[in-house]
Amino acid sequence: MNRSIIYFPEKEKAVFETAEADATLAPNQVLVKIDYDLISAGTELANYHDLPNTEVSIRKFPHYPGYTTSGHIVKIGDAVKKYKIGDRVVCAWGGHRSWVIREENDRIYPVPEGIDQKDAAAAHLASFPMLAIRKLQIQMGEACLIAGQGLLGLIAGQLARIAGAYPVIVSDCSPERRELALQLGADYALDPMAPDYVEKVIQLTDGRGPETVVEVTGNIQARQQVLECVAKNGRVVLLGCTRISDQPINVYKYIHCKGVYLIGAHTSNRPAHDPAHWGASEADDYKSFFKYLKSGRLKVSSLISEVASPREADAIYQKIGMSANPPLGILLNWTDIDNDIPR
């Protein structure tokens, strides 16, 4: 059966390709027709540009990007018990492709009734800031600074508010993203390029600095800023991947003397199903995501700037990878990519 995919054959080149692929199922497998697929700009562009500390830097090209999708089951193996044909699901780490095969308990999760498939496609991506917020262990009334307002940062700000943080302060260089963050419930939105940025953050937190910080940019200058303004004995969680990570920081001044907790929150540290020692798995985070989404407390539809055809892959990645003001969120629409898949 044919399958369409997007991949990077070389640096700064994206290709949409259709080729024959084996769709034979093992007894415990399902075939998922992908409906929508959200581009994760930070991770995907790091590989697109062949930056350090990426999969491409280790395994080289070709690279197959994409990890957060929604779809529906069109074929099941003889031993599958959990799903039936027609069930809506989200899949993790499936790549940008028209269909995927999954074992019924392997990073696949049912979509509840009442959830739009476009919103559901963000489930796996949204679980990353959920991991960061869980690890921060925010207490009611603690201030939280979110540095960076891309997709992850905009979701992290909403989750910090849900967790009880006040005030929620966000920062981003883009005026449009700062305004969107305010619309989504942030209390303050600051420009990190302003010369008095650190002083403003401290002023907004009664002179103490925020007790909790989510660093989403992966930028070394942003990391330095948050270490300067975080409160004594505060917690800083590193959510954004620091691709160029060998620049020095004054550990004695900004971490040791201030008693700061520096917390890693890479998704690879979280189990898919069995709760971690601090009590949550990837599946738990999906469940929470859908609860918050259905209740209206978490919003992701306003993060989507454009719904695009996968056939336009090269133009899409040129737009987000080469533009000075790239779109925030691009959702790939696979519903018209048929590949002779049974319906």
Language model features by range: what are they?
Residues 184-263:
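Glycine-rich cofactor phosphate-binding loops and adjacent beta1-alpha1 units
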Residues 22-39, 51-95:
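Glycine-rich beta-strand-centered segment in the early N-terminal region that forms part
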Residues 41, 93-105:
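A structural motif shared across PLP-dependent enzymes of the aminotransferase-like
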Residues 116-195, 199:
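Mid-domain Rossmann-like dinucleotide-binding core that forms the NAD(H)/NADP(H) cofactor-binding site
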Residues 207, 237, 244, 248, ...:
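C-terminal capping/lid region of NAD(P)-dependent oxidoreductase domains
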Residues 250-304, 315:
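C-terminal substrate-binding/catalytic core of Rossmann-like NAD(P)-dependent dehydrogenases/reductases
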